[in-house]
From Swiss-Prot:
Organism: Homo sapiens (Human)
Any one of the GO CC terms: cytoplasm
Protein name: Xaa-Pro aminopeptidase 3
Binding site residues for Mn(2+) 2: 331, 342, 475
Entry similarity comment: Belongs to the peptidase M24B family.
An annotated Gene Ontology molecular function: aminopeptidase activity
Gene of this entry: XPNPEP3
InterPro entries given in the database record: Aminopep_P_N, Creatin/AminoP/Spt16_N, Creatinase/aminopeptidase-like, Pept_M24, X-Pro_dipept-like
List of residues binding substrate: 300, 331, 342, 424, 431, 451, 475
Domain of life: Eukaryota
Native organism taxonomy: Eukaryota, Metazoa, Chordata, Craniata, Vertebrata
Length: 507
């Protein structure tokens, strides 16, 4: 390949310009699937934890906690296998994948938000610095999925590192992630002429770029130029999402950790919910308990909704007082080592369900148990959703909430009291792989949520007065297996007796 550098060489930026424009292929290097064992992590701080600086978090060979260089290389290999199938019959002999990192976002002048990497970029390489580009390039004379992986990263800059902390640089990026080559970000421009060639098919998400500035500087001109050729730029996000949909054993282990620590945070939050209690206090308690147990951040702003506010599905103000006799609905999760949890529990803040609360809660719990039993290969989230609506319709009749409803209107009535779906895919994102339809047959390794609810606003004149103002949702995280479903949130209490026992010990 004209611009290929032999992998072991990491030379100054000026020399690298020549390397990208023309150099011999290093035939001794086995690209892509196996990282180079002799590359040692620099004995300095990088732009993210490494086995050298954070041995309490990462073992040797890991890029992120629990995920090795080999795991990341295998993901890239699988992506190029998908591209090989997609590219059959298309013109163009070369294939190039471009994935941008996220930028740093700012809440106000000089005040950044906590950086969060683009999850497609992170999934393929594990590199956690902003302003970076991952390129996967097919190799001349070799069939896909053979390829090389290249990272373009911010150059080391002592003046910026004084303020913002260390950067990995090219040597750190290549040693930590196990990619084949690494260069400074500015050198990416030397790849553009080759990618513009008629023989090169480029895979890049130009419709939804994750980094507006890098898109404007580099990829927008390329996309516009190739729009006039036979080989237009093709999106890659759906292919990556197809891979992300099925979790590896290492990913499931990460999600088990997130589920366990979130479950413990729920228990500790229940312990402290003595009425009256502020929603803001429960919010703070939940976040503290997640972080104290090793979570990096909360996965999303939690819903901490007392009383009638539980009927606002995405209530996140969390600034009211929960009164004695009211329930609280807490929908919360954390992110731990790049993977998230998403759990919902509803409980009485005074430690005792009233009779109407218990009736409604037990109805939702029975529906949830029945839905969990359907989480096996071959069914789908859409199938489970239909069953949930049927079950809700029957429970609404049993509770006297839905009267004189004909069978053909039962679904519509059920949707009134549960206007959301039964669940969604879960992984690196809360609403993971959003382009993947819920009608897909479930497969072992998929992770989903099951979260039925019944919500009865206080002004609903159709419902019996005793139920008005009550909202209940129960949500668990589930791994689909060949056998029975694996409940990642099994440690989080949901039986009424267990909840009352915990809440009775509130301090």
């Amino acid at each position: 390949m004209p611009w290929l550098l032999s992998a072991p060489k990491l030379v100054p930026a000026v020399a690298n310009v020549r390397g990208l424009s023309g150099c011999m292929l290093c035939s001794q290097r086995r690209y892509s699937l196996q990282p180079v064992p002799e590359r040692r992590i620099p004995n300095r701080y990088l732009g993210q934890p490494s086995p050298f600086t954070h041995p309490h978090l990462l073992r040797p060979g890991e890029v992120t906690p629990g995920l090795s260089q080999v795991e990341y290389a295998l993901r890239r290999h699988k992506l190029m296998s998908l591209i090989q199938k997609e590219a059959q019959g298309q013109s163009g002999t070369d294939q190039t994948v471009v994935v941008l990192s996220n930028p740093t976002y700012y809440m106000s002048n000089d005040i950044p938000y906590t950086f969060h990497q683009d999850n497609n970029f992170l999934y393929l390489c594990g590199f956690q610095e902003p302003d970076s580009i991952l390129v996967l390039q097919s190799l001349p004379g070799k069939q896909l999925p053979s390829h090389k992986a290249i990272l373009f990263v911010p150059r080391r800059d002592p003046s910026r590192e004084l303020w913002d902390g260390p950067r990995s640089g090219t040597d750190g990026a290549i040693a930590l992630t196990g990619v084949d080559e690494a260069y400074t970000l500015e050198e990416f421009q030397h790849l553009l002429p080759k990618m513009k060639a008629e023989t090169n098919m480029v895979w890049y998400d130009w419709m939804r770029p994750s980094h507006a500035q890098l898109h404007s500087d580099y990829m927008q001109p390329l996309t516009e130029a190739k729009a006039k050729s036979k080989n237009k730029v093709r999106g890659v996000q759906q292919l990556i999402q197809r891979l992300r949909l099925i979790k590896s054993p290492a990913e499931i282990e990460r999600m088990q950790i997130a589920g366990k620590l979130t479950s413990q945070a729920f228990i500790e939050t229940m312990f402290t919910s003595k009425a009256p209690v502020e929603e803001a206090f429960l919010y703070a308690k939940f976040e503290f308990e997640c972080r104290a147990r090793g979570a990096d951040i909360l996965a999303y702003p939690p819903v901490v909704a007392g009383g009638n506010r539980s009927n606002t599905l995405h209530y996140v103000k969390n600034n009211q007082l929960i009164k004695d006799g009211e329930m609280v609905l807490l929908d919360g999760g954390c992110e731990s080592s790049c993977y998230v949890s998403d759990i919902t529990r509803t409980w009485p803040v005074n430690g005792r369900f009233t009779a109407p609360q218990a009736e409604l809660y037990e109805a939702v719990l029975e529906i949830q148990r029945d839905c969990l039993a359907l989480c096996f290969p071959g069914t789908s989230l859409e199938n489970i959703y239909s069953m949930m609506l049927t079950l809700i319709g029957q429970k609404l009749k049993d509770l006297g909430i839905m009267k004189n409803i004909k069978e053909n209107n039962a679904f519509k009535a059920a949707r009134k009291y549960c206007p959301h779906h039964v669940g969604h895919y879960l992984g690196m994102d809360v609403h993971d792989t959003p382009d993947m339809p819920r009608s897909l047959p479930l497969q072992p390794g998929m992770v989903i949520t099951i979260e039925p609810g019944i919500y009865i606003p206080e002004d609903d004149k159709d419902a019996p007065e005793k139920f008005r103002g009550l909202g209940v949702r129960i949500e668990d995280d589930v791994v689909v297996t060949q056998d029975s479903p694996l409940i990642l949130s099994a440690d989080c209490p949901k039986e009424m007796n267990d909840i009352e026992q915990i809440c009775s010990q509130a301090s």
